[in-house]
From Swiss-Prot:
Name by which UniProt lists this protein: ATP synthase subunit c, chloroplastic
Membrane topology listed for this record: Multi-pass membrane protein
Underlying gene: atpH
Keyword check for Transmembrane: yes
Subunit structure: F-type ATPases have 2 components, F(1) - the catalytic core - and F(0) - the membrane proton channel. F(1) has five subunits: alpha(3), beta(3), gamma(1), delta(1), epsilon(1). F(0) has four main subunits: a(1), b(1), b'(1) and c(10-14). The alpha and beta chains form an alternating ring which encloses part of the gamma chain. F(1) is attached to F(0) by a central stalk formed by the gamma and epsilon chains, while a peripheral stalk is formed by the delta, b and b' chains.
Keywords: ATP synthesis, CF(0), Chloroplast, Hydrogen ion transport, Ion transport, Lipid-binding, Membrane, Plastid, Thylakoid, Transmembrane, Transmembrane helix, Transport
Length: 82
């Protein structure tokens, strides 16, 4: 295996996990803050708000998992090596 391709794969996998975690992390923080604010304003709607929050958090977390899958593919099943 070419050492340059190997080093680039490690760097790319690190970047894919790091960059894939930034957006969902910010989004999850914002969504949780807005959910807490919504529950504080309307306590009777807590069940609907919490259900919607958990579903949206799962969708946001899936983006981070996709970044992890790309990183693992680059590390262990690299298509750029012969």
């Amino acid at each position: 295996m070419n050492p340059i391709v190997s080093a680039a794969s490690v760097v790319a996998s690190g970047l894919s996990v790091g960059l894939a975690a930034i957006g969902p992390g910010i989004g999850q923080g914002t969504a949780a803050a807005q959910a807490v604010e919504g529950i504080a304003r309307q306590p009777e709607a807590e069940g609907r708000i919490r259900g919607t929050l958990l579903l949206s958090l799962a969708f946001m977390e899936s983006l981070t998992i996709y970044g992890l899958v790309v990183a693992l593919a680059l590390l262990f099943a690299n298509p750029f090596t012969a």
